[in-house]
């Protein structure tokens, strides 16, 4: 059986890691042992933050909606409750975009939702 030398394989692996570490600071970009750790940690952060991104954007949409709805005399929580009662099934992202780019349409949605709320005494 022929002898297997791993020079080509390990060189390719090292190249792959160093390519991923491109742009890192200090020895993290050119020392394989340190670069490997840095790339691994970077991938962990990327995985974690793909999940966090969803939370962050939802929070942003809610903040925007809260600000937009308060201009119409409601709070965010009462607005969402009113939407549910009036049977309007539009997600927070779409409502947020509507509030920014189509204020008139958003105002109509708010008025429709307000009509589902009980009148204050």
Swiss-Prot record:
GO biological process: ribosomal large subunit assembly; translation
Record PROSITE patterns: RIBOSOMAL_L20
Domain of life of the source: Bacteria
Any Pfam family hit: Ribosomal_L20
Entry GO terms, CC: ribonucleoprotein complex; ribosome
Transmembrane segment boundaries: none
Protein family (similarity comment): Belongs to the bacterial ribosomal protein bL20 family.
Main function: Binds directly to 23S ribosomal RNA and is necessary for the in vitro assembly process of the 50S ribosomal subunit. It is not involved in the protein synthesizing functions of that subunit.
HAMAP family: Ribosomal_bL20
The name this protein goes by in its record: Large ribosomal subunit protein bL20
Lineage: Bacteria, Pseudomonadati, Pseudomonadota, Alphaproteobacteria, Hyphomicrobiales
Record gene name: rplT
């Amino acid at each position: 059986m022929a002898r297997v030398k791993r020079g080509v394989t390990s060189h390719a692996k090292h190249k792959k890691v160093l390519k991923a570490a491109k742009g890192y600071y200090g020895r993290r970009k050119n020392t394989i042992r340190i670069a490997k750790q840095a790339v691994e940690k970077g991938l962990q952060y990327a995985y974690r933050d793909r999940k966090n991104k969803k939370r962050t954007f939802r929070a942003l949409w809610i903040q925007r909606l809260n600000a937009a709805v308060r201009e119409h005399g409601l709070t965010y929580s009462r607005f969402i409750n009113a939407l549910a009662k009036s049977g309007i099934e539009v997600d927070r992202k779409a409502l947020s975009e509507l509030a920014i780019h189509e204020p008139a349409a958003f105002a109509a949605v708010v008025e429709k939702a307000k009509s589902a709320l009980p009148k204050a005494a």
